[in-house]
Amino acid sequence: MAINRWLFSTNHKDIGTLYLIFGAWAGMVGTALSLLIRAELGQPGSLLGDDQIYNVIVTAHAFVMIFFMVMPVMIGGFGNWLVPLMIGAPDMAFPRMNNMSFWLLPPSFLLLLASAGVEAGAGTGWTVYPPLAGNMAHAGRSVDLTIFSLHLAGISSILASINFITTIINMKPPAVSQYQTPLFVWSILVTTVLLLLSLPVLAAGITMLLTDRNLNTTFFDPAGGGDPILYQHLFWFFGHPEVYILILPGFGMISHVVAYYSGKKEPFGYMGMVWAMMAIGLLGFIVWAHHMFTVGMDVDTRAYFTSATMIIAIPTGVKVFSWLATLHGGSIKWETPLLWALGFIFLFTVGGLTGIVLANSSLDIVLHDTYYVVAHFHYVQTMGAVFAIMAGFIHWFPLMSGFTLHSTWTKIQFVLMFIGVNLTFFPQHFLGLAGMPRRYSDYPDAYALWNTVSSIGSLISLVAVIMLLFIIWEAFSSKREVLSIELPNTNVEWLHGCPPPYHTYEEPAFVQVQRSF
């Protein structure tokens, strides 16, 4: 019965599929919200109403894209599908908890949408800073609903993280060491450790905000001896690792895609890649205050956070050059996933360079809360995380469905999307350097040109997203079956055929390890 299969599933492949479908649906909502933002900003003057409704849309766009699109797709979707197949496990360590992790997300999403639907909505930005998020500036239940939504999404992620960590450490064949697992498995391991360490801090911060709003505590209210800066420290101690949580699984997927389409049996510098991911994970926890350069920190504190932030560029550079070295000398197959991966490498590097600019506290004081930061963030996320999702989706779609996507149309869709996102976000660097602040629904006429260009870019991206839906429909409609897979011995997820049987590795895999070191 369909209800038993999908509602009560304990199968990692089915739960992965549920995550992918949920993430795609949330992605449509998040895209719609982003188009409302760009429609409002396409011309000077007001379109949708006041700043409150505009900021509700901005806040919802951020939460939907982060918690209900990127994380469910990368960690829940690709993680569930691929990790057990890549390590030879019959399923996840805790299959029923896996099911609960997924089913906590739709109620969480519902609470977030409800927060926008009651009173005036939560127009706080995704950071939910008090006193704007307090009960004076945001009377009513909107912010409370947002907090409960975040609680549920957080519990979901923590449970999934426990599940992945246990699975990856305990469910490998005995002969396989951790340093022989694929890089995607490593990326999920590092990501889930980051989630496990950072989410409880967010939970503490938003719970304190909840009691400040409803129970008259004063954690963040100077009138009772509290400090709103404490909230910023708690939030960003989660918020900075979060952006690495969003990109690390993408790093893992890009490593697989680049190696596969370069015709290599493994990525260049495997150990360097692993240690780089662990270094990024560690450093991600000790740089949070670079989001707070404008709150009046000591000069030595600012110096520390500036240098610590710049250090993250080193392991990131190790990864970028290892991807390029993997491509070097390969028999390159110019298929769509590789195009997405190459776009990722180039544009993520551009985003990383603007990150180096923002790491300088003196420069950041000028650029903070301008569109320069928006441009930086969207270069590393839209053109990092989303490009990685696209590369991984097109690469593994035949594995998950048994059908192949139309290669020419996916290439056209890549070109459209590439033009769209660059046209959307590149001009925002100019707006930021010219001093246009974020989170305002209107602007002086001087900023009109680049805002118009940016909004046109967003419409091109929309066409590309709609085209992707058509391409997926076309694949299921035409039913072109997979013919052959190259190098299934080094890409073990393909070993069982496309799609793999409902249950794989029912007997423990026999692994004979050849040690080359």
From Swiss-Prot:
The chain crosses the membrane at residues 12-40, 51-86, 95-117, 141-170, 183-212, 228-261, 270-286, 299-327, 336-357, 371-400, 407-433, 447-478. Fe(II)-heme a binds at H61, H378. Na(+) binds at E40, G45, S441. O2 binds at Y244. Signal peptide: none annotated. Pfam families: COX1. It catalyses: 4 Fe(II)-[cytochrome c] + O2 + 8 H(+)(in) = 4 Fe(III)-[cytochrome c] + 2 H2O + 4 H(+)(out). It is a multi-pass membrane protein. Pathway: Energy metabolism; oxidative phosphorylation. Residues 1-11, 87-94, 171-182, 262-269, 328-335, 401-406, 479-517 are mitochondrial matrix. GO terms for molecular function: cytochrome-c oxidase activity; heme binding; metal ion binding. It is found in: Mitochondrion inner membrane. Cu cation binds at H240, H290, H291. Its cofactor is heme; Cu cation. PROSITE patterns: COX1, COX1_CUB. Binds 2 heme A groups non-covalently per subunit. Mg(2+) binds at H368, D369. There is a cross-link at H240-Y244 (1'-histidyl-3'-tyrosine (His-Tyr)). Residues 41-50, 118-140, 213-227, 287-298, 358-370, 434-446 are mitochondrial intermembrane. It comes from the Eukaryota. The keyword Translocase applies. GO terms for biological process: electron transport coupled proton transport; mitochondrial electron transport, cytochrome c to oxygen. Component of the cytochrome c oxidase, the last enzyme in the mitochondrial electron transport chain which drives oxidative phosphorylation. The respiratory chain contains 3 multisubunit complexes succinate dehydrogenase (complex II, CII), ubiquinol-cytochrome c oxidoreductase (cytochrome b-c1 complex, complex III, CIII) and cytochrome c oxidase (complex IV, CIV), that cooperate to transfer electrons derived from NADH and succinate to molecular oxygen, creating an electrochemical gradient over the inner membrane that drives transmembrane transport and the ATP synthase. Component of the cytochrome c oxidase (complex IV, CIV), a multisubunit enzyme composed of 14 subunits. The complex is composed of a catalytic core of 3 subunits MT-CO1, MT-CO2 and MT-CO3, encoded in the mitochondrial DNA, and 11 supernumerary subunits COX4I, COX5A, COX5B, COX6A, COX6B, COX6C, COX7A, COX7B, COX7C, COX8 and NDUFA4, which are encoded in the nuclear genome. Belongs to the heme-copper respiratory oxidase family. This is Cytochrome c oxidase subunit 1. The lineage of its organism: Eukaryota, Metazoa, Chordata, Craniata, Vertebrata.
